[in-house]
């Protein structure tokens, strides 16, 4: 995996250090995460609080000296915000005003710094997670007002069956609009196991890779 990232960075004239690999460990036990910690990896992504919360506690038990950074990458329900903030420092899926309101309520209760991305909906399906690009500036304004929270940029998932390059072009366009409002919010959380090399070529700063690192999910997951 690291060799593929290095090759993609070399091909696009980028430094490997500019791309953060977030290992998606959903449906895998804390023991698998511990193996990755032993290899020196410390950035992990989860998409369900009911799985991630106990997993983070278990990892702290079996690797008490490790200091992982947990990324929450799934659609975040407002009633799960408080629980997620107990372990995740980076939220990749901010997508609506009600979620920002709950973050504003809960963030002051926690110490340390947090950061995250606004998730974009690249489809015409309003039921899918993410904010439509035309609504990005208004949502960004509210995120920028959060206490102790840094807006890093935008996140998106390329649609199934869609050309990832064309999809990521939409993300780049939205990112440029966001930077007019918040110049430092220039990071891109794009790219998964199937398309991370395209994402790196398009400027990804965070890639979210699961099966290419951990292998297939357990059959009972």
Please report, for each region that a protein language model flagged, where it lies by residue.
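Conserved alpha/beta-domain cores
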Residues: 2-194, 200-202, 214-216
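Divalent-metal-activated hydrolytic enzyme cores
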Residues: 205-206
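Active-site loop ensemble at the mouth of alpha/beta enzyme cores that anchors a bound cofactor
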Residues: 220-221
């Amino acid at each position: 995996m690291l060799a593929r990232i290095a090759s993609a960075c070399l091909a696009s004239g980028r430094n490997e250090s500019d791309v953060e690999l977030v290992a998606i460990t959903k449906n895998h036990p804390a023991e698998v995460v511990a193996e990755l910690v032993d290899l020196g990896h410390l950035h992990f992504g989860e998409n369900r609080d009911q799985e991630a919360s106990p997993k983070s506690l278990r990892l702290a038990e079996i690797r008490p000296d490790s200091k992982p950074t947990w990324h929450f990458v799934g659609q975040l329900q407002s009633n799960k915000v408080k629980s997620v903030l107990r372990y995740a420092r980076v939220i990749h899926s901010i997508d609506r005003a009600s979620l920002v309101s709950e973050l504003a309520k809960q963030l002051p209760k926690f110490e340390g710094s947090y950061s995250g991305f606004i998730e974009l909906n690249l489809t015409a399906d309003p039921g899918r997670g993410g904010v439509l690009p035309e609504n990005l500036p208004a949502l960004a304004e509210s995120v920028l007002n959060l206490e102790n929270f840094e807006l890093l940029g935008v996140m998106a998932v390329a649609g199934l069956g869609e050309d990832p390059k064309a999809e990521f072009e939409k993300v780049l366009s939205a990112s440029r609009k966001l930077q007019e409002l918040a110049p430092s919010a220039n990071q891109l959380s794009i790219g998964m196991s199937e398309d991370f090399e395209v994402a790196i070529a398009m400027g990804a700063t965070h890639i979210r890779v699961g099966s290419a690192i951990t292998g297939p999910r357990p059959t009972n997951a």
